[in-house]
Amino acid sequence: MLTTEEMELLLPEMTLIAGIIFAILIPNLGDSTLRIPLTRTRIPIFIGGTRFKSTSDPRVPARIAIFALFVAFIYSFLEIEGASGEVGGVIEITSFTRMMSFVFYGALLLSAIATTYRMPARTSARAPRENDSESLTEALISALMDNRRQVDFHILLMMVGLGMGLMAMASNLFFMFVAIELAGLAAYVLVAFHKEEEVGGEAGAKYFIVGSVASATGIYGMSLVYLWSGDLDFDALATSWAAMDGLDPFAVIGVGLMLVAFGFKVSAAPFHLAAPDAYAGASSPVAGVLATASKAMGFVAIFRVLIQVTMPEEGEALWFILLAIIAVITMTWGNLAALTSDNPKRMLAYSSVAHAGYMLAAVAAVGSGLGDTSTTELVLVAIVFHLTILVLFKLGAFLVLAMLETEGRSHRLEDLHGLAQRDPLIAGSMFIFMLALAGVPPLSGFLSKLLMINGIVNISAGTGSTSADAIVPWAESVDPVFWLAMAIVLNSALSLFYYLRIGLVMFFEAPENEKPLRKSLHLRNTILVLTILTVFFGLGPGAEYLLDLVEGAVSDL
């Protein structure tokens, strides 16, 4: 039984649980009554019967989800500074956990808002009649299906948030995996949610199969770690790892298998193969969650296992070389694949793979053991800062595609042609999001990449020969960590080609459809706010404030 203090610590998660319960109950409230046995008296039970008009409104589930996620988002933000507590021996609340739940709930809140336009609830929807045209009949059936699925979608969205929030707070490896699977199972269904579309069902099947194999591999690795240590608490595992004499095969293989599961979550090569299909088949708001919140969840797991458990106090980590190689392959493969993609959602999926490579390179630099405490913290701050602001411009780009999806578009590059003529503000926002993803100053995407590169260079500082009189001898003498920074720089330059291509087709190509975009007032305003924040957190007091917030959170990692 949770105490009042523990319930207060878990208020965001308790709010989501309440939201799930209300989303199930409220739409089913009606005038049903129950007769008391052996009497003629009937008492109202309110579940079933003819549903009340106010609670049967198909917009109710979305309102419940948006309200619950908003409360969780705001409370997480308010608790970033000073959050501290423990619940049940498997949950630990710190500034870091609240920082990450702030990221998770923010991404899910934006997705919920966008879904009100991507899958709108129509109160005027009716059943088709015999004299209706074929096109009208299809439209009416589609509207009724959207109404029918409102509860399912928003319950799943809140379940994803609940799993992610609990995962961030996990102080036990088993509990962390349970929370990851709670979020993952709901995400599999969300990817395949529009199963009436061919790409939706196929994407969901691929994502589920690959994700299930990755999860099974990770859980098997966890069992090997338990056989080795006899405990799954992170602090106990860290103590056992530090005291390990030599390399225990159970421990090493177990950690390696768990990294397969985490690699799938962050879309690292070669575990990224299902990601492009999943992003392309899912609705744009859901794809945005996969590219931001799901990726952040995977990196939290990587931090727990690689940084908190297996990172030695001195010297190189066991996984340094392997992770560095995976990072370079991931960023290069992602950018090369994005160059050849003509589907905007697949392009953003490969872009997400590349960004995973950038952050894995930073984690690998920490594993080199060359940095002191301050430089290590600098790199971790850069990663968490990047995960945070990625919600602004990566999810923002998917929200722009969500506006096109309301017209049945967004699956071809041609759908973006002439967007500046149809809606200059939205086209301008999309272009800013692309520049931020590429890392162009003075946007927040540039600052996060600069911090990662600066941190990696600081870690490798002093490893090159000062007596070298040419570039080649110096390059041979410098530590390989330095080349991770160079890989990020070169890949960022490569990515400019496909990000700028989006801008070119929006501003210089003729539109296939010259009608203005649909109003979508709240979605439009959300996109514009994300655009402003993308610039605001790239320089000046905005960047300083967010960096201070992230730095305080990382110090609690």
Per-segment meaning from a language model:
Residues M1-L557:
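Alpha-helical transmembrane segments of multi-pass membrane proteins predominantly involved
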